[in-house]
Each structure stands twice: as C-alpha cells, then as structure tokens.
C-alpha cells in the first residue's frame, strides 16, 4: 500500500504542472467557477513492477486513459539489455503522458519504452515518474530524449553498481510487491 500512496502523492505533485482551465460547475445551491484539467494525462506503466505505483496514479487521475508496456531486463553480461515485449496504449499524439516505473536505474528501459511509444505519435509533454533513481539514469535520459520531458522521483540514490542496480536502492520492486519471478 505504501507504494500506491507514493503514487498518489507523486500524481498530486505532477498535477500541479498540468494545464488547467476555468469552468462553471453546478452545485445544489448555485454555480461556482472551478479549475479542471484541460485533458487528463495518459498513464503508462511498465508491467509488473510498476503496477502498485501506477495504481496510486490511477486513484488520483481516475478518468485517465491507460497504457501498458511489457519490458524486462535481461540478466548477465556487462551491458544492460532491455527486452521490450508488449505495448498497448491509446493515441499519445499531443497528449500529456506520465510514464510510471518505480526504478530509474540506467535509464535505458525508459528510453527504449519512449522510443517505442513515439513510433505511434509525439506527446505534448512526457512526465517520467519513478520511486528511486540513480544519477546515471537521469543523465542517460537527459542525453537521449529529445521530446519535452521532466523527471520526477521520490529519491535520488548514490549510484549504479557493476550489475547496473541502484545503490542503496530497494531491490527488485516487482519481487518486493509480488514475490520472486519463476
């Protein structure tokens, strides 16, 4: 539940940067002016690890369209290899996108996922939301994404180790939430 709560808090923080418009709202006692989102952002998460964090965002942006990415890290060797196996999303053209993944380690899975998404359109802005990030991952994203974007994280940890894990990090987010993979 704590990861969901962090998703709700991060969603609120990001919502403060989204475009709003003023609108008349009817109440039982009259009419009031209120600020409402111009359009709800599209929420996209990397499955399995991202699902609890994503749920917090969905609790906050409860009218948002949703997308899902199936990506995983291939173990072994000196390089990080990201396998992208699944992509399902509504049209992202000219929309605000929040890409939700709890761990921003090397940044390669974020960039690979974004490049796959951009084959289907270009968003007006991309918000990258993580729980824990490594400086190397933030640097990689800044050097390799050309679309308007911002990075949001709950914690910036020290570094990546030789196996490209965040140190001190929190371990495998998917395993922590759901148990070890087979």
Segments and roles (model prediction):
Residues 1-182:
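PRPP-associated nucleotide enzymes
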